[in-house]
Amino acid sequence: MIELKGVVKRYPGSKVNAVDNVSLQIHNGEFFGLLGPNGAGKSTIIGMLSTLLLLTDGEILIENIPFRRENMDLKRKLSVVTQHYSLRNDMTVWQIMELQARLYGLPKKEWVPRSKELLTFCGLDSECKKIVRRLSGGMKRKLMLARALLTDPSYLILDEPTVGLDPTSRRQIWDLLRILNQQGMTVLLTTHYMDEAQMLCKRIAIVNRGRITRVDSPENLIAGLGSYAVDTFDGVHTSSRFFSEKHDALNYVAE
């Protein structure tokens, strides 16, 4: 289980918290979504889970153990796929996998067959010799996913995994994530697409101005949007204005 307890992040020079007293539990085997607009604090939460950002206050636990940057055993259990393409454009697909294996000290007899398996799973087995800069956006996303899976993590965390992709590529990524979750992997993603969160997630947390305003199943959130006053993504308007119809809620994309 991933647990956040009173997590706070304030950036140097800021007078407000980017993440403000967030407490959350993500259960093993769950597909969980953080839904909110750009600037809501979703990526900051992901940054702290990846240990790239230090907490200002609070605590993160993985399997009831405090999660620290130096705890490599726990870090191996958790892989993060960032929103931006964190790939070297001058390397081939295969070299990207090899570099990841070396960073984690994986023996060749393990990472070579594992890489072949993952690239096939992600539909990239015929692209091994292709330079990254020649890949489409969808292929780059798939490569980042394959790379993240190389260490055989228990927890997969993705920050806006389909942003900027065409509908076909989005569906392909969704299908891969569903399969991984069905195989028992715990998946946490951030998104500002209500349809994406509803389609994939068992539970959704609404994130607004650094706070979690509601956690519920997609069905309950959608059912309540027409009558239950919840904070929407801009933090000003109520559901009666933005979500007067359930259909609108499903197709709403936060600005």
Regions found by a protein language model. Give the residues of each.
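A short, flexible loop at the N-terminus of ABC-type nucleotide-binding domains that lies
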Residues: 1-4, 8-21, 28, 70-71
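Conserved ABC ATPase "signature" region
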Residues: 98, 102, 109-127
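Conserved ABC ATPase signature
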Residues: 131-135
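ABC ATPase "signature
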Residues: 215-216
